[in-house]
């Protein structure tokens, strides 16, 4: 076992012809009165109706990280402790800082510092998928759209220019934007463009001289990061991570100031490799589920950049990730363990 920062990498070396990577992030989003996690006995009022359906006599694991993704981490730890006769060599990766800006991502740091630690023929990330397969992922970028004004006393507003009022046009463009559903290699990815934060003003009696609308764009894997950025701010705006504010030369936010905050590429489904096909076949036989598109960003994109085919497969519903009542039925953990155990033996 090797460690880089808060990321642990453990590998078997039995001389198998192929190597499979099992990866899971250790961090969660902030708690919302849902920590520490705990088991809920059948009938507990905290068990959601949609989770209880079909699992009436089952315990549920409740609390922050239950689905995203401590449940899957637990399954991988179980496999690491018990699976001694796998037909592939295995690398387990448990990493930090997945839920924050890409520059802090523990997997990214390991890849940059020790690329030989993260080598393999196929990777599975335990993001919540209801134990089905979700292929690829949307890309993501976050940026501030900025308006500028002139500060003045609010009793003499005509002496200034209100940057918050000017931001109304940013919101108008967001409201007018039509998010698209895009098919890539047989899977349908839903794009999204949303304001997630807004800030402006320095005092309650001061006309604001700046307003920032923080925007998150989730884009399908039919386009590169550069192509997605061009759709938002133009191809030659010059806005890059860490280089300050630039004016959008085209795209949705043409004419506004832009400061890039975070960006990560998308990944195509990655289901064409023989290892992926054999896993798809097993999951379909056991659950009746065909692969779906992963709508959020995950580190399958990072494996894709390394030339390693990767899919998402984990316990719990992706619809409950980050929710205050995050939870999963106990059988999801058993199903994930059984699927991976049988596929790896």
Residue locations for each model-derived region?
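Acidic/histidine-rich catalytic neighborhood of metal-dependent amide-processing enzymes
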Residues: 69-142
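Hydrophobic/aromatic beta-strand patches that form the interior of the parallel beta-sheet core
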Residues: 20-22, 93, 124, 309-311
